[in-house]
Amino acid sequence: MAQVRARLSGVTKVFESGNGRVHALGPLDLDLGAGEFVTIVGPSGCGKTTLLETLAGLTAPTDGTVSFEGKPVGDEVPAGVGVVFQEDASFPWLNVWDNIAFGLRRAGVAAAEIRARVTYAIAFMGLQAFARAYPAQLSGGMRQRVCIARTLVLQPRLILLDEPFGALDQQTRLLMGDELLRLWRETHATVLLITHAIDEAVMLADRVGVMSARPGRFIELIETGWPASRSSAIVAEEAFGKLTAHVWSRLRGESLRALGRTEAEPAGSVS
């Protein structure tokens, strides 16, 4: 692996609820190399989002340590880390240009630098025709392009994405995946993406992390072997089908366990 950019070591997360303690995550370990693209799949409720929020500094682990570029992650998103969620996070009262510039203005970046970065991000994400449009005038895919562009202008070295294309149709997801791969290649950022779509996870990743049912742990980290130049065209390759089938074979049992079922128990059976 290349130089480690982010690391989770022995991380667990326990939540207190009205019904007692909920062991949501871990213990688990994960190293993210500089310039690596890692995707994570797992059953619903296994702690995927909790893992991302822990790495981003949005929630503290109950046990274990989290670091970014060798420094402990505290209780806020570290400089150099960008986060994109599934939910539309654009500001409806700002047009596309001002949405993308928002974080730079808050950070006190000089006006000329803001213009240069926003102009580049808008061109990179294919938003030139929509720079003065408002979020309500855009499709879901275009709004996600705006959110990714808003992260891009901050020049993050680690990009964390939680189901960024979850609300999009399959064709748009594949095309957005191609855009994300292009962004990854050009910026050399480390990317961690959470998804429920196995084909998306396999297409995008250098490594696919498969998580267990709650409490979430890694049951396998799978090397894909794809070249950095990959695109959605690989979904038609035989190797892609085999790798996708392998990921599902590891995930299926955990998904059944999360539903309280076993391999031998058919759906709809009643005990």
Walk through the language-model features, giving the residues of each.
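Hydrophobic anchor residue at the start of the ABC signature
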Residues: I148
